[in-house]
Amino acid sequence: NAWVDAYIEVHDSDGANDEHHPCYWAIEKFADMEMDFPDLNWAAMLQIISTTTSDSVIQSLAEGPLEELVELHGVEYIDKIEKEAQSNLNFRLLLRELIETTEKTIWNRILRARSDD
C-alpha cells in the first residue's frame, strides 16, 4: 500500500516537518479523510502498525490519526478499539502513546484496553 509505505517513510526519515518531503502527502491524506472516511484511516493505521514498530512512526500515529479518530469518532470506534487491543499487542502499544483528549467514559475504556491486565 503506497499510503502506508509513504507514511512510514516520511516519519522514519524525519520528513514529517518538511512539507516538501516526497512522502508528506501521506500525512495530509490522514487529515483529509479523518472526518468523512474514518474506516479507511482505521484500516491504514492497522496496516502501519503491522508493518513497523518504529518509535517515531508509532508516536506520530498516536498523536495524529489515532487521536483524531478517537476525538471525532470515539463513540463509534470504542468497541473496535477494545476488540483490537485484546488481540493485538502492537495496537495496545499504540494506545499507550495516546494522550487523554476525549470524553471521560471513552477515555476510561481506552485506559482499560491499553493495559496488559
Language model regions located:
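Alpha-helical solenoid scaffolds in large eukaryotic transport, assembly, and signaling factors
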Residues: 1-111
